[in-house]
């Protein structure tokens, strides 16, 4: 992000709320079931997102921030709002205020029950301002609070394109297998690959797992999970195959790729935060972007979508398979060396055992004494 300049920000109560010509203003409203859906999607991240920005455009609302050290984008489509009207070019607002309040506080779960969130916009770019009015209901009465934010005059943000180049739909068990692999090492690269011979792979320097692919919806993917040739090639790799009977549904480009996330911990933490209650997730790969990105979209209606930056300058999946086989063996050997079984600890301290006849003589001597 480069060169952010922003105006001041103000907070008003109901008695000092500024008035303007209604014809020069427009608004976006979340209420009822649509508010509950959006709140459920955001509740897992609103308490931990750092430096959040909120972007409004014709497509909807986008929340951008940092979660667990990784950039995360949470898009909410315009159809997900109770009322959505937008005028002019895209506007960017800093969610934080001078106090502890933020524009995302309305989506936190607390004792005050929010019934409606209204964003009212006035002005002309680049001097538009946003008025957020949050209406609460408690014990038969209602009250509201208001925050006014001014548009960032100069800001540069990254908005991912809508459709990934390749998407893999994983069920809950398949996603858990990848998370298990990521948990075996700390702060190492997690590599994803679509092989030219067929099959979707995920792994680290310690372990690699593979999945059969149902590529009937893919373009330029010559293999299918039901073909004997593809199965033979995957089995020949010598790696264990996850969910053997259930193929991963894939769509998009079938062109081979190999991308890496720099930190297994970040991937695991982010996915754990957004996958609550999900029956699985879609992993979408933006292979033609610079830098490439990974999109994680849980199989829950209204759930947030995380976008993580990847690196294409990484170890190939073939090299990773070789390294994981050797590294895994070395790791197991070191564990047995540094943490021997209790039954072996005493034997390592003693010297070589005496011949049987010497042991019998020593035992007789002890008894005579």
Curated annotation (Swiss-Prot):
Q: Which UniProt keywords apply?
A: DNA replication, DNA-binding, Host nucleus
| Disordered as annotated region, ranges | 345-369
Q: Does the keyword DNA-binding apply?
A: yes
GO terms for biological process? DNA replication
Cellular localisation? Host nucleus
Family matches, as InterPro entries: DNA_clamp_sf, Herpes_UL42
Q: Name one GO cellular component term.
A: host cell nucleus
Say if the entry is tagged with keyword DNA-binding: yes
Q: Which family does it belong to?
A: Belongs to the herpesviridae DNA polymerase processivity factor family.
Q: How does it assemble?
A: Interacts with the DNA polymerase catalytic subunit. Interacts with the origin-binding protein.
* Identification of the protein by name: DNA polymerase processivity factor
